[in-house]
């Protein structure tokens, strides 16, 4: 039978002498620590087995290490264990419990860290080593060696800026007086004889309770009414909450966050008791009573507080605790609710105060508006009274304008808010009709321009720059022009003859910057253009003595592209008239020349090729070249059209009908013993008949060079019996001179092209300089010969309006907006140029 159980301690561990054997019996320690996952198995030493609970433990021995067990100290003296049997763990626990209740507290019961540590000595411990264990050596004379030196430390400090009597540091923030020490009265622990703070410490650091002291005091006062199971009397400490703390708590927990709201709806199953309980929020768990389960033995309800003993629970009344806690919670909620109500009332007072200030301002504004409206009403009633037929002092147009100026200057807001259209219709329109009653626009085209300009600034709505009849109800000035001024214009246009265009053009030029754009468009499209179209249809170029351009071209600045539909019938009628035309009749050039810049280049060239060039070719084909008797009329008739037809068309006529006959005559002349001086003059004479632009053409240049080559071959071939003296030299000189002129002309042309390229490069470099979008549009308008100018007094949403040809535009943040039928449409610059052409 094994006797290992005799050496087992109360915790079920085996002594170090038999560490290779272990008993698997279940002890009380195993039952108590069954559910303790952090339990540590402490192997009992020989000293613990000998002395039991009175064994002295060194803190160094209990320090955890990486090894499974502590290494044996073979330098320690040998100790012997007396024979005998150890008591069981249960008996030792009972003895310890009985001793704890009766025995007084001794110094050995305190942890060994609070008392002097005993030094265990053995037989082999040297006596010389015992002096280090009893205590520390006195250091009263420490630093006495300084008085035998030169004081180098003090000198070094003074070199670094130290001033005697002041603290160390950059700002002298160090302490001056050394820290005072206070000797403890006895050998007790810290705080056993009262406060140990010195007078200097109390002055520098006033007494303030730490958080740990406050927590200990709170735990004592909290459990004052309960009896301690251990039997010792403790002073309870209560927790107090101020009203401010409750208010702060109420402000923080006023609104639940989203996760808290979600957790408040979570279903919780409590399986900690004998029965399964279901809660529908985590808050219900906090209100659960701490009542022990019925039917369980008292021992199973008590949880051990330590590994060796279990502390009995105190006297508990969960129902009373719940009621008290409920009363406390209700009181806290009432305080929090009252605080919230008070804050709400204060906020309401502030809000009402601001509302009162705002309403006071609104009331003052309304009073001013009422006062101004009353004055405006008086002025309007005065105008209405003077508009009556039986009034002795009738209202004039100038006086009415002054009244409206007063309304606009002094009562601007009321004037803009009022219905100006109805006011103008009732007062201004009758006076305006009376003013223009005897007006004849063709005789006095500037009549009424000043008065209408004044009323334009008074009545026109800047926010509604309308250009269509649908906006008449929103703009008083547009309605005034349409209903009062426009009937006189319609009446006079119906009586106007289109061939007498100057009075009508002057009239519209005088009013173009005053009347709205859409009204001007209506006059040109609906009144003027139909009259011109009808007159063009009745025009006959063979019988009419008045040229058509004399009464069509004056309309170009106003109508521009609107006249495009008239050009096709005009070209058709001119083409019919030129069927029997001969180049000897110069009247055709006089009729066609004004239309060269009006027609597009393509249509003009097509018209010339179809109707003029064939006639000139026939005339040039009839030309007879005779050096002895030359008739130049036919040649002059053709050359006279040089500016009207293109250079390529003229050169084509010369190549086909002139140069073959001219070279043939030259060859015949050279083959009959000619006079080379006369041939030279004849050559230079014909060449002088052409302009530089024609001579610069490569085909013409080749023909004249061919004539020079023929002349050189004639003088160098010795044809004939007689050769004129100096003829060869003269022809050679002529050839050299002509070639030099051609070379100089080509060099001059190249120089001009280089200069033009340089100018274009300068222009491109200048154009690379940042400019605004308006400057770019202006540059493009100049390049394409399009009129670009601002419309005086016209704005749309605060943006200046411009006329780009016949199109009305405005520019907003680098975007061009073109007036459409009802709205403004953004467009590109190239599309704008195409529309303007």
Curated annotation (Swiss-Prot):
PROSITE patterns: G_PATCH
Segments of this protein annotated with the region Required for nuclear speckle localization: 710-734
Region of interest: Required for interaction with DHX15: 1-50
One GO cellular component, as annotated: nucleolus
Keywords: Biomineralization, Cytoplasm, mRNA processing, mRNA splicing, Nucleus, Phosphoprotein, Spliceosome
Signal peptide positions on this chain: none
Disordered as annotated region, ranges: 1-21, 53-72, 85-133, 179-236
Coiled coil: none
Chief subcellular location: cytoplasm
Pfam families named in the record: G-patch (PF01585), GCFC (PF07842), TIP_N (PF12457)
Record field: compositional bias (Basic and acidic residues): 1-13, 53-64, 103-116, 217-231
Compartments, as annotated in UniProt: Cytoplasm; Nucleus
Phosphoserine PTM sites in chain numbering: 2, 59, 98, 144, 210
One BP annotation, GO: spliceosomal complex disassembly
Domain G-patch residue range list: 149-195
Motif, Nuclear localization signal: chain positions: 700-705
GO MF terms, alphabetically ordered: nucleic acid binding
Family (UniProt): Belongs to the TFP11/STIP family.
Self-association and partners: Identified in the spliceosome C complex. Found in the Intron Large (IL) complex, a post-mRNA release spliceosomal complex containing the excised intron, U2, U5 and U6 snRNPs, and splicing factors. Interacts with TUFT1. Interacts with DHX15; indicative for a recruitment of DHX15 to the IL complex. Interacts with GCFC2.
Name of the molecule in the record: Tuftelin-interacting protein 11
